[in-house]
């Protein structure tokens, strides 16, 4: 369940590698029920503020998490009456990034509003007020926070699809790093999403477990303890879901300048993903670059049948800063 590149880079993972042989397919109800929630419960939207931009209105909101507490989010609404396409965005978890939250894709979402997109950008559990850092790599919260992140995204879909100005047939998800891991699991779980952009994320714990880095991590943590944890949460291996993403289309964006998720390893991850899919590599660090942004906007424009955006508007979106690794 999660980014092995971050696990091995930081030693202290955001989400551990969860692997068990001969796992059930994603359609297995016993696996899927871990992500059930009460869809009939009130969403509980509350407004905290509003910013009116030239091409869109940005609402600062919260909605209730089925796992407790509230989910802070931005809701970006285009001008006009719709019907609009809808995109959910999942941010990265890079430790010392100021964009380790719903702000990561805000500028991109505002530009896409010109093409007719309503966007929901959420704060993952790590970015919410009162979150306590997890220091133990096999702390149960590694798993429970990942489960909450997935369910909160499903609840966010409920929020979007409850709107009369959203076209239910034009819904996408964009996720980066940890957000890509969440999206990979969603792709085999929630059929309401028609297209996925998964950026710089590992797609299979089984692939990761074959690496030397994983074996070293296993010995460091304690093989018996880690194996027990892995077995308990085996249903969180995103490879069991993204291999069943079809008929949704998946666009995988990988960075060539990764310390762990090398192009060779990334190709093995890409092979796990069901067709139809697209795969592209970029000469960039984990944050990716402007070329990747142009490509995913083009992909989203085609998949969601959006209005073409001015090149100047796309070029004006700032690049995500890549901080140095705090553990090096």
Task: Give the positions of each predicted feature.
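Conserved alpha/beta-hydrolase "acid-adjacent" motif
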Residues: 259-265
């Amino acid at each position: 369940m999660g980014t092995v590149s971050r696990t091995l880079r930081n030693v202290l993972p955001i989400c551990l590698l969860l692997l068990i042989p001969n796992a059930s397919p994603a359609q297995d109800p016993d696996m899927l029920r871990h992500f059930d929630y009460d869809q009939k419960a009130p969403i509980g939207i509350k407004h905290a503020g509003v910013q009116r931009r030239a091409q869109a209105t940005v609402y600062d909101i919260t909605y209730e998490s089925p796992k407790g507490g509230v989910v802070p989010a931005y809701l970006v609404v285009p001008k006009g009456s719709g019907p609009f396409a809808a995109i959910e965005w999942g941010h990265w978890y890079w430790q010392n990034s100021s964009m380790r939250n719903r702000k990561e894709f805000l500028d991109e979402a505002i530009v896409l509003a010109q093409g007719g997109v309503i966007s929901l950008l959420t704060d993952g559990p790590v970015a919410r007020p009162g979150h306590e850092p997890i220091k133990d790599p096999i702390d149960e919260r590694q798993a429970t926070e990942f489960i909450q992140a997935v369910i909160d995204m499903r609840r966010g879909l409920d929020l979007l699809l409850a709107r009369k100005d959203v076209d239910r047939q034009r819904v996408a998800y964009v996720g980066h790093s940890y957000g890509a891991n969440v999206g990979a699991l969603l792709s085999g779980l929630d059929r309401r999403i028609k297209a996925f952009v998964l950026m710089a994320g590992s797609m299979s714990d089984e692939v990761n477990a074959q690496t030397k880095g994983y074996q070293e991590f296993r010995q460091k943590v304690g093989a018996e303890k880690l194996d027990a944890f892995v077995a308990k949460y085996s249903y969180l291996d995103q490879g069991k879901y993204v291999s069943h993403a079809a008929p949704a289309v998946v666009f995988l964006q990988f960075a060539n300048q990764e310390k762990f998720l090398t192009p060779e390893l990334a190709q093995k991850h890409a092979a796990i993903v069901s067709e139809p899919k697209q795969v592209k590599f970029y000469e960039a660090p984990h944050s990716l670059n402007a070329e990747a942004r142009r490509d995913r906007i083009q992909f989203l424009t085609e998949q969601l049948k959006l209005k073409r955006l001015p090149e100047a508007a796309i070029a004006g979106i700032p690049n995500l800063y890549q901080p140095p690794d705090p553990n090096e």
